[in-house]
C-alpha cells in the first residue's frame, strides 16, 4: 500500500483542508506562498521548504531566566487572548498586550501548544507536525518576533509541548496504518496500538523506543536553537510509560525517560527549564532532584474559598505533597519543584464558580472581587514558582464550558473588563503583590522561614508569616468570612513596629483585632523602607 504523507521534520506544513480559514491579516500571502494551484491539486498535509529561507534578526540573542524558582508564569492561549470576534487571536495581536503583562508583573509566558495541530480552532493538543509552527496564529518570523519582544521586556517564553500523543496524520502513525481497525498497526515501532493509560487521546508515543526519545530530543533542541524558547511545559507526562499497572504509582521507567529529556535540555541550554503536568506525587522528589518542576493544581481549595466554604478550603497543598504516606513534605523536595496555580486552562474559572456561595446564594459582584484579591494574596506571596491562567487577574467569570465545550472559543473581554473599576482594582492588586514579590526576592528564596495557617481549623481568618534570610519580616492576614467581622491576629515576636505595606501606617505591638470587610487583607512589613508609600 502506498502512503502519501509529509516530512515529520518539515519546518512548514501546508494544510489544504484548513489553510483557507486563516486570515490574510494573520498570515499574509499564504496562498501566494504555497500557490493556489497547489491547494487545488494537493490533498491533506504538505511539506515545503525554501532554499533561501527568511532570516530573523534577533534583538536579544542571549536571554536568561534570572531565577527559575521565582517564576510567575502567565498561561496564554493565543486563540482567545486577543480579540477573536472575527477570527482567531494571533501572535502579532498578542504582542500588543505585552505591556499589559509586563505591568501586571509576570516574568514568564507559557504558550499553549503552537506546533502544527489539527484544524485551526483548537487548544492545540492534537499535534501532527512538531517542527512546524501552526499558521493559524502567524508566520514563523511572527513567533520569533513575539519571543524576542518578550525577552526585551524581561519575560521568558515557555512552550507547552505534547509528547504523550500525536494525531493519526503524523507520518510515523500514518505509515503503519491498520485500515481495518482504523488505528496504527501492531508493527509500528513509534506508537502504541492502544494507549497504556486512560488519559490518552489520539495515538500514544512509545517512549521505550530509543528512536522516539531521539525524535523528541531533536525537537526540543530545534525549538531552543531556532526559536530561542526558555523552557517547556510537558503535557500529560503521567503517560510516558509502557507499564499500565504503574500509571498512578511510582514508575522508575517513566522517571528515567523524563530525566533523559531534562538532561538533554540542560545540555542544549543549561538555563532552559522543564515543567511537567505530572500529578504523581510519589515521583515529585526524584523529578525535583533532577531539576524538573511539576504542576501543582490548587483549583479546588481556591474555588471553595471563593464560595465561602472555608471549613474545607485548605491552601496547604501549594507548598507540600498531598501524599501523606510518603512523608514528602516540601522540605524534602528540591525548593521550587512545585509550580502552583489556582487556575489553568483545564479547570473551572474561580471567578465564575465564585458567583455563588456553597449554599447556593448569590455573592455580590464587588464582594466576589474582594475575595479574589484575598485569594491572590494567599497564592502569589507563597514561595516557589506560580502560574496565572489568562484573565484571572481581571476576574474572568465566563465558564470553561461556555460555547458547549471546554475547548470552545471563549469571549474576549480584556478591554471592556479593564474599564470596570472593580476588575481594574483586582488587576492592580495582582500587580501590587507581584511588585512586592519582585522588590523583596529574599522572602521567596530557599532560606526563608515561612509559616502559614490556612486550613479549615483556622476558621474564616487566614494567616501567613515570613522571615527572610536577612532578617526582614512580612505578615499577611485576611477575612475570608461571610460579611464584615473582627479578625484577631497575633504577630510574630521580634518586631517592635510593623508597617502597612500599602499605606505606611504603623502597627505597634503583636496583638491586633481590626474590623475587616469581607475579602479584605492586610500586608504588614517590618521595615518602613519596604512600603509602597
PLM feature segments, named:
Residues 102, 230-234, 386-392:
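Active-site regions of oxyanion-processing enzymes, predominantly non-cytosolic
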Residues 1-71, 86, 520-522:
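The feature marks proteins involved in alpha-glucan
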Residues 372-373:
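Conserved interdomain hinge at the start of the Helicase C-terminal
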Residues 9, 19, 38, 55-68, ...:
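Substrate-binding/active-site clefts of carbohydrate-active enzymes
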Residues 509-533:
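C-terminal beta-strand-rich structural cap/linker in extracellular carbohydrate-active enzymes
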Residues 344-347, 369:
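Glycine-rich, aromatic-lined ligand/substrate-binding cores of catalytic
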Residues 84-97, 354-363, 404, 506-516:
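Short, polar loop/linker segments at the starts of domains and inter-domain junctions
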Amino acid at each position: 500500500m502506498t502512503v502519501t504523507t509529509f516530512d515529520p521534520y518539515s519546518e512548514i506544513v501546508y494544510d489544504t483542508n484548513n489553510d483557507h480559514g486563516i486570515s490574510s491579516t494573520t498570515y499574509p500571502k499564504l496562498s501566494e506562498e504555497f500557490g493556489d494551484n497547489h491547494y487545488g491539486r494537493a490533498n491533506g498535509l504538505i511539506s515545503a521548504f525554501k532554499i533561501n529561507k527568511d532570516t530573523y534578526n534577533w534583538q536579544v540573542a542571549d536571554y536568561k531566566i534570572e531565577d527559575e524558582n521565582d517564576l510567575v508564569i502567565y498561561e496564554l492561549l493565543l486563540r482567545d487572548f486577543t480579540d477573536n470576534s472575527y477570527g482567531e487571536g494571533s501572535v502579532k495581536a498578542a504582542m500588543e498586550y505585552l505591556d499589559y503583562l509586563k505591568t501586571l508583573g509576570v516574568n514568564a509566558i507559557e504558550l499553549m501548544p503552537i506546533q502544527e495541530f489539527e484544524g485551526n480552532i483548537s487548544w492545540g493538543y492534537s499535534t501532527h507536525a512538531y517542527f512546524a509552527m501552526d499558521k493559524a496564529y502567524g508566520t514563523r518570523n511572527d513567533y520569533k518576533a513575539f519571543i524576542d519582544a518578550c525577552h526585551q521586556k524581561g519575560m521568558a517564553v515557555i512552550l507547552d509541548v505534547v509528547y504523550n500523543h500525536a494525531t493519526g496524520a503524523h507520518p510515523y502513525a500514518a505509515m503503519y496504518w491498520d485500515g481495518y481497525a482504523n488505528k496504527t498497526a501492531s508493527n509500528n515501532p513509534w506508537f502504541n496500538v492502544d494507549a497504556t493509560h486512560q488519559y490518552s487521546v489520539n495515538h500514544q508515543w512509545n517512549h521505550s523506543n530509543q528512536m522516539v526519545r531521539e525524535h523528541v530530543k531533536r525537537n526540543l533542541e530545534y525549538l531552543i536553537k531556532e526559536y530561542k524558547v526558555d523552557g517547556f511545559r510537558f503535557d500529560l507526562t503521567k503517560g510516558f510509560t509502557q507499564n499500565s499497572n504503574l500509571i498512578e504509582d511510582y514508575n522508575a521507567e517513566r522517571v528515567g525517560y523524563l530525566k533523559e529529556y531534562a538532561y538533554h535540555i540542560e545540555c542544549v541550554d543549561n538555563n532552559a527549564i522543564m515543567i511537567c503536568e505530572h500529578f504523581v506525587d510519589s515521583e515529585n522528589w526524584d523529578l525535583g532532584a533532577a531539576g524538573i518542576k511539576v504542576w501543582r493544581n490548587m483549583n479546588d481549595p481556591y474555588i471553595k474559598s471563593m464560595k465561602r466554604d472555608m471549613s474545607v478550603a485548605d491552601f496547604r497543598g501549594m507548598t507540600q505533597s498531598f501524599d501523606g504516606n510518603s512523608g514528602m513534605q516540601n522540605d524534602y523536595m528540591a525548593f521550587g519543584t512545585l509550580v502552583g496555580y489556582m487556575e489553568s486552562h483545564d479547570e473551572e474559572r474561580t471567578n465564575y464558580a465564585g458567583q455563588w456561595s456553597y449554599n447556593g446564594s448569590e455573592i455580590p459582584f464587588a464582594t466576589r472581587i474582594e475575595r479574589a484579591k484575598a485569594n491572590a494574596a494567599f497564592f502569589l506571596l507563597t514561595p516557589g514558582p506560580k502560574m496565572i491562567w489568562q484573565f484571572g487577574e481581571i476576574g474572568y467569570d465566563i465558564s470553561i464550558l461556555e460555547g458547549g465545550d471546554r475547548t470552545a472559543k471563549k469571549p474576549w473581554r480584556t478591554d471592556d473588563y479593564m474599564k470596570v473599576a472593580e476588575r481594574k482594582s483586582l488587576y492592580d492588586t495582582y500587580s501590587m503583590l507581584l511588585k512586592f514579590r519582585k522588590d523583596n526576592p529574599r522572602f521567596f528564596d530557599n532560606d526563608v522561614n515561612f509559616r502559614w495557617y490556612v486550613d479549615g481549623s483556622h476558621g474564616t481568618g487566614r494567616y501567613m508569616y515570613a522571615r527572610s534570610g536577612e532578617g526582614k519580616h512580612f505578615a499577611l492576614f485576611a477575612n475570608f468570612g461571610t460579611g464584615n467581622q473582627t479578625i484577631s491576629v497575633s504577630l510574630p515576636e521580634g518586631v517592635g513596629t510593623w508597617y502597612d505595606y500599602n499605606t505606611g501606617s504603623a502597627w505597634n505591638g503583636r496583638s491586633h483585632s481590626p474590623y475587616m470587610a469581607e475579602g479584605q487583607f492586610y500586608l504588614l512589613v517590618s521595615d518602613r523602607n519596604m512600603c509602597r508609600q
